[in-house]
Amino acid sequence: MSSRKTAGRRATTKKRAQRATSNVFAMFDQAQIAEFKEAFNMIDQNRDGFVEKEDLHDMLASLGKNPTDDYLDGMMNEAPGPINFTMFLTLFGERLQGTDPEDVIKNAFGCFDEENMGVLPEDRLRELLTTMGDRFTDEDVDEMYREAPIKNGLFDYLEFTRILKHGAKDKDEQ
């Protein structure tokens, strides 16, 4: 009986991992997705639809490597949950797309958030983006603001970072 409960919990956890990253398929064309699927299937040694520590070990061993448990744990801990194909795409997508880690993005915005509230005045952020560093045009800022979480003139950079890294929430999750 406990094995059914455990299996049910595992399936629920796996389902959540997939839903949280479902927008990742828009990052790649069909040919790229097919290549990633082939690579995923090569790593998923036991063919259960998930890459687990043992799968990584077996795959690396087949390449003549002898990875330590710490090394494998480090690889597994890069994912916030079980590594199904969607999560696999997300992990590689972030590396291929060259986006910064979530905390780096939050900290960059946070440098200008003197009250540490997680928001910046919309007009102040526009001024910063158009006058400092790699300057944005007003059109660039307008485009960013079109989908940005702005309420009462405040840009929610914590939510913006979440959207940037994980995609917008599905309508049924809001």
Swiss-Prot record:
GO terms for biological process: actin filament-based movement; apical constriction; apical constriction involved in gastrulation; border follicle cell migration; cell elongation involved in imaginal disc-derived wing morphogenesis; compartment boundary maintenance; formation of a compartment boundary; imaginal disc-derived wing hair organization. Disruption phenotype: Mitotic defects including failure in cytokinesis. Disulfide bonds: none annotated. InterPro entries: EF-hand-dom_pair, EF_Hand_1_Ca_BS, EF_hand_dom, Myosin_RLC. Keywords: Calcium, Metal-binding, Motor protein, Myosin, Phosphoprotein, Repeat. GO terms for molecular function: ATPase activator activity; calcium ion binding; myosin heavy chain binding. The modification Phosphoserine is found at S22. The modification Phosphothreonine is found at T21. Pfam families: EF-hand_7. Phosphorylation plays a central role in myosin regulation. GO terms for cellular component: actomyosin contractile ring actin filament; apical cortex; apical part of cell; apical plasma membrane; apicomedial cortex; cell cortex; cellularization cleavage furrow invagination front; cleavage furrow. It comes from the Eukaryota. Residues 31-66, 100-135 form the EF-hand domain. Transmembrane segments: none annotated. Ca(2+) binds at D44, N46, D48, D55. Myosin is a hexamer of 2 heavy chains and 4 light chains. This chain binds calcium. Required for cytokinesis, could regulate contractile ring function. This is Myosin regulatory light chain sqh. It comes from Drosophila melanogaster. The gene is sqh.
